[in-house]
């Protein structure tokens, strides 16, 4: 998820052996907090479907919160392990080595699952010229707000809460919904004897 220029980063993943690449880009996603980001990504993952393991980074460089991966797992009802430094896949199970402050923890989890990984996980593959040329035939799908939207009420999931404050005030003060009070704290029209 990012601006159009993020396609180059996804292409690099294709150069290094990924089968498909997906980019979520739209001005509607700009400035999204972790909840909005995880909602958009989970919606895209549901739309793409057919996955065993969703692998993400430990944290974003802009927010540095490490919340998006676990929030996606929650929205997709998947088991998740964070700070993964090693992965071994066997049938429908994944054994991971999770980085801790004072060592490692080995965890076995069933697929489908979501893993957020530390940079020590592996060394990037060498990109051959042939591989770079071949990747241009691999699909890079672009998703935007229109291709991802599922229900109009969920539109709010893509925006920061503070952007919705004006909309909330309008709903609260809409005709028939608002109440007026006098200086004594009594609702106008009420009679107190």
Give the role of each language-model region.
Residues 1-193:
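N-terminal glycine-rich FAD/FM-binding segment characteristic of electron-transfer flavoproteins
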């Amino acid at each position: 998820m990012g601006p159009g220029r993020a396609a180059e980063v996804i292409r690099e993943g294709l150069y290094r052996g990924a089968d498909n690449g997906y980019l979520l880009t739209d001005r509607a996603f700009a400035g999204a907090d972790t909840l909005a980001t995880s909602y958009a990504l989970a919606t895209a993952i549901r739309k793409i479907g057919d996955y065993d393991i969703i692998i993400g980074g430990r944290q974003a460089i802009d927010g540095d919160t490490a919340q998006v991966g676990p929030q996606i797992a929650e929205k997709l009802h998947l088991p998740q392990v964070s700070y993964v430094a090693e992965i071994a896949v066997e049938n429908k199970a994944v054994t991971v080595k999770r980085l801790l402050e004072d060592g490692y923890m080995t965890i076995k989890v069933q697929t489908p699952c979501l893993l957020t990984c530390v940079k020590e996980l592996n060394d990037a593959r060498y990109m051959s010229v042939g591989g770079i040329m071949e990747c241009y035939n691999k699909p890079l799908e672009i998703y935007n707000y229109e291709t991802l939207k599922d229900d109009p009420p969920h539109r709010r999931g893509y925006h920061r809460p503070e952007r919705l404050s004006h909309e909330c005030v309008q709903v609260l003060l809409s005709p028939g919904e608002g109440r007026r009070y006098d200086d004594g704290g009594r609702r106008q029209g009420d009679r107190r004897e």
